[in-house]
Curated annotation (Swiss-Prot):
Protein name (database record): Large ribosomal subunit protein uL22
Keywords associated with the record: Ribonucleoprotein, Ribosomal protein, RNA-binding, rRNA-binding
PROSITE patterns, sorted: RIBOSOMAL_L22
One Pfam assignment: Ribosomal_L22
MF terms in GO: rRNA binding; structural constituent of ribosome
Claim: Ribosomal protein is one of the keywords in the record: yes
Coiled-coil intervals: none
Length: 110
């Protein structure tokens, strides 16, 4: 039994979110929540919310026992990038890339 949760268009870069996702892949959900709770990264809070949603989906939709759930899959794909302009000296301008990502978490029982 698998349950899935997604956060699309998360306002963090995929590269930064993957650092957090790699830490919880394959862990028991309770241990994964602990790791995310004490991580100082902004992406950890986003991934934690998606993991909590996946756990709730498993319990409500599939009737799964929370104590037996593990993080089966977690992956982060790139979302669209918003391009902005930052004015600089002497009439120049720099491009600012505001990146987004799609975070997906799949939990399954052993």
């Amino acid at each position: 039994m698998e349950a899935l949760a997604k956060h699309r268009f998360a306002r963090t870069s995929a590269q930064k979110a993957r650092l957090v996702a790699d830490q919880i892949r394959g862990l028991h959900v309770e241990k994964a929540l602990e790791v995310l709770a004490y991580s100082p990264k902004k992406s950890a809070a986003l991934v934690k919310k998606v993991l909590e949603s996946a756990i709730a989906n498993a319990e409500h939709n599939e009737g799964a026992d929370i104590d037996e759930l593990v993080v089966a899959k977690v992956f982060v794909d790139e979302g669209p990038t918003m391009k902005r302009i930052k004015p600089r000296a002497k009439g120049r301008a720099d491009r600012i890339f505001k990146r987004s990502s799609h975070i997906t978490v799949v939990v399954a029982d052993n």
